[in-house]
Amino acid sequence: MRVIILKNSNETAKWSAYRIAKEMLKFKPTPEKPFVLGLPTGSTPLKTYKELINLYNEGIISFENVITFNMDEYVGLSPDNKQSYHYFMHEHFFKFINIKPENINIPNGMATDLEAECQRYEDKIKSFGGITLFLSGVGEDGHIAFNEPGSSLSSRTRSKELTHDTILANSRFFDHDVEKVPKLALTVGVGTLLDSKEILTIINGYKKSQAAYYGIEGSVTQMWTISALQLHRKALLIVDEDAVSDLKVKTYRYFKDIESKNIDLEKMKEELLTYK
């Protein structure tokens, strides 16, 4: 596992966007060999999406041959519902880039047969050879996507009942009314996530410092979904200074030292031009 420690959320967003762009450019996607990108929603990735949009507008990257799979969707919300993740992704990312509508994949929370929908989603991911890079955020309790504490670390895409803490946290998107928040969602599983060739997880802020601790120093446990990333051969944790406040000083110094040559944002962006 690599841990990249940066000053703040602006820097974690830039680093993450530049990393994604680099992998896309190195991959050289074509219609026959698309780059498959896994995406999250929520507040964490917003700045990263803006940075990716900037790179697209500057002509550095293209999404023409990129296929996306989102992590999750609420059950019972139609795609045109302003609180749905379909709507979120369109308004914050997709409408600003040149991705083809048919290349966008988000679980169908309106499906009449949720189990069949989850299997269809898994099968479609596999049909493209799996996720090339999965971008993710993490909750204060360490959940990734809607894999709440206690989720099986080998779980696949499925419907999941949301915990009270998650409902409470997400109520900020529903006029701070917990009664308006759906109680069920479709989510990729931890096993689905771990099948990705690379996982890039952004962690910002003091409130998520405990999640960062369990992800980096804790034991692997189903009670902290983020800890499963320790099992992945190519996991990247992109964290700001506030998020690593619970780490041991020795751990902090180790990662700051070993990654010291890999945090120059200007150099990272300049490097992208060499792949054009």
Listing of model-derived features with the role each one plays in the protein:
Residues 1-37:
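N-terminal glycine-/serine-/threonine-rich phosphate-binding loop
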Residues 50-62, 85-87, 149-158, 218:
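A glycine- and small-aliphatic-rich helix-loop capping segment at beta-alpha/alpha-beta transitions
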Residues 145-190:
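Class I SAM-dependent methyltransferase SAM-binding "motif I" and its flanking Rossmann-like core
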Residues 195-276:
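ATP/nucleoside-binding phosphotransfer catalytic cores, i.e., glycine-rich phosphate-binding loops
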